């Protein structure tokens, strides 16, 4: 198989299980399997080093990018309210949190040169 959709992998009463499921998603991506974790409010995917992915707006409003391995370099986001160009994201400074689609944009494009990203898309409140 080339894609996996994990339902029931987010939320719940045990945060450590959610974190473990994020790690599982990264492990699948490292093996060439496209991983998506989804619940009723959020969808989580990954952008691997050297990869560019497009995120159509659909029903999502908020868009966040976090370095899954502690640091990501050469991060670019286009089509977002706060665009990034050759940025460095670190776990200690969450620069990529709570972004939005730019006015008139129906897609955000994300790439990373080094370090995997976890992408969180969330519906508006």
Region annotations inferred by a language model:
Residues 3-54:
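Anionic-ligand-binding alpha/beta catalytic cores of soluble enzymes and soluble regulatory domains
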Residues 42, 47-125:
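Long, charged alpha-helical interface segments
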């Amino acid at each position: 198989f080339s894609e996996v959709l994990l339902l029931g992998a987010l939320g719940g009463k045990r945060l450590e299980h959610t974190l473990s499921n994020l790690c599982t998603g990264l492990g699948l991506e490292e093996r060439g399997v496209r991983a998506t974790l989804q619940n009723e409010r959020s969808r989580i995917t990954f952008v691997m080093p050297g990869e560019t992915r497009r995120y159509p707006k659909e029903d999502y409003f908020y868009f966040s990018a976090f370095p899954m391995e502690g640091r990501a370099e050469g991060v670019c986001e286009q089509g977002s309210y706060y665009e990034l160009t050759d940025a460095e994201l670190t776990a200690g400074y969450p620069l990529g949190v709570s972004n939005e689609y730019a006015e008139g944009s129906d897609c955000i494009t994300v790439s990373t040169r080094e370090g995997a990203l976890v992408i969180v898309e969330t519906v508006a409140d």
